[in-house]
Amino acid sequence: MATVSNVWQPEFMQGRFFRLFVSHTSAHRQAVGALRAALLPHGVVAFVAHDAIQPTQEWLDVIVRALREAEALAAYLTGDFHDSAWTDQEVGAAVGRELLVLPLKVDQDPYGFIGHYQAMNANIDTGVLARQIAAVLRTHGLTKRPMAEAVVDRFVHSDGWNSARENLNRLKELPADVWAPWLVEAVRLATSSNTEIQTADVGFGQSTVAAEALKLIDSLPGP
């Protein structure tokens, strides 16, 4: 995997994350920041550029670099979205790269390049919205393979019993056709090298996360 900017690496966390650029205006930074936090457990790191009035050249460079490295874009569509000097350009850049664009409708319908896209309702609980976004990224043809890499890597880096259980559940949600041999091997190795995965129980002590993960990958169809 090519080296990417450190803007995509969450603090105190390591490994591979799916890179989602979230285009929004500065008035909605708090809501988008909450969404960013809710996406992290799903293996998604959101870059949340905002509508600075007079951004410095350095800040613009960061935005341009993030747009080049993003694997999908979400447009947080509010009434002031079109008034921004930057948001439409960010969406246009993603469309030009043929990335998946997710319109998140707060109070503005998709328009322009994404006018024909089906919007997701953003006026719901942030955790629910994050789960819905992650579900789309896991299954859409443009994103399901890089998303699988991120989900498997989250499992490999499970740092507690709860995270091991949650990450196991996300493994189970991956489509069968994204399981490249090296992803299968990464899961298999984690079951013997990560003590949290080895010792976390599931089903009221009836099994362990490691055992269930092995059962999952052994049930996958062959190449």
Predicted regions, residues:
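C-terminal interaction surface of TIR/SEFIR-family domains
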Residues: M1-L20, S26-A31, Q108-P223
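Residue-level signal for short, function-critical loop segments
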Residues: H24-S26, T78-G79
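Cross-kingdom TIR/SEFIR domain
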Residues: R36-M147, N194
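Short catalytic-loop micro-motif centered on adjacent basic/acidic residues
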Residues: F21-S23, V48-A49
